[in-house]
Amino acid sequence: MASKTLRVLFLGPKGTYSHQAALQQFQSTSDVEYLPAASIPQCFNQLENDTSIDYSVVPLENSTNGQVVFSYDLLRDRMIKKALSLPAPADTNRITPDIEVIAEQYVPITHCLISPIQLPNGIASLGNFEEVIIHSHPQVWGQVECYLRSMAEKFPQVTFIRLDCSSTSESVNQCIRSSTADCDNILHLAIASETAAQLHKAYIIEHSINDKLGNTTRFLVLKRRENAGDNEVEDTGLLRVNLLTFTTRQDDPGSLVDVLNILKIHSLNMCSINSRPFHLDEHDRNWRYLFFIEYYTEKNTPKNKEKFYEDISDKSKQWCLWGTFPRNERYYHK
């Protein structure tokens, strides 16, 4: 019997770093269809509502710029929505969402300065134009700020303009389209990956323009919780990452410390903590926060998970375990 084709969503278009993360995750799977999504919300929504989709790959954080807040907020919103759907009073304060995290991927971010046309003198050719319009994803600007500042100082006679795009790969496509419509004294460039330049048959002016070496983006691999098939996760180590979100009883002094202290009591090492504001509805008070923590457990080490969960339930207002998954070996790469 022929094996089922896996259908995997990623933040498109093709040639993005999200595409690379999806390829890394399923590189050992022979029959995979990679489907570009137009936005991070689509990566969530389509996975939840289209049963033909098996997995979705979304960016979570960058080692230079920090959180990808769209992804954090989409996780937050799903927990809150699920909590509001529970009957009152609910039997438990543990929330079980419709999707779960089953793996992580890390993709080195190596940006290139890309041109739709061949420039005979390379970067020096920029001085021949009155205006240079640079296209890229908003997340990129903070990763190449020093490079762009240096370029502007090198060509003070040139006006540099930045234009946001939905993805790095789309920025190459957009600069190609724009260059055919503008006059000769305007040059359109893009900042994207070498893969994106090759995909769109564009020219790389300069490689590795990142301000910091080792810049990396972390991605989560999601699936529907009722999808009980093979997770397609390559398990190479003993260390597990657990992603848990919770809210506190805001007016109780020390309520956040009480939750975090449970990790110490159970000898669990927390490796990450973040927070996002939330509202239950338009009448809800401001300045309430949902917390994201990640902590380690080991594959073959017995832990009293149920007692840990009981303690979390006792000290938090509501909580959700999004998944337990292997620590990817790329996490340790510099």
From Swiss-Prot:
Conditions for induction: By L-phenylalanine.
A molecular function GO annotation: prephenate dehydratase activity
Pathway the protein contributes to: Amino-acid biosynthesis; L-phenylalanine biosynthesis; phenylpyruvate from prephenate: step 1/1
GO process terms (BP): L-phenylalanine biosynthetic process
Keyword Amino-acid biosynthesis (UniProt): yes
Keywords: Amino-acid biosynthesis, Aromatic amino acid biosynthesis, Cytoplasm, Lyase, Phenylalanine biosynthesis
Additional notes on this entry: Present with 2020 molecules/cell in log phase SD medium.
Protein name, entry field: Probable prephenate dehydratase
Annotated source species: Saccharomyces cerevisiae (strain ATCC 204508 / S288c) (Baker's yeast)
Organism lineage: Eukaryota, Fungi, Dikarya, Ascomycota, Saccharomycotina
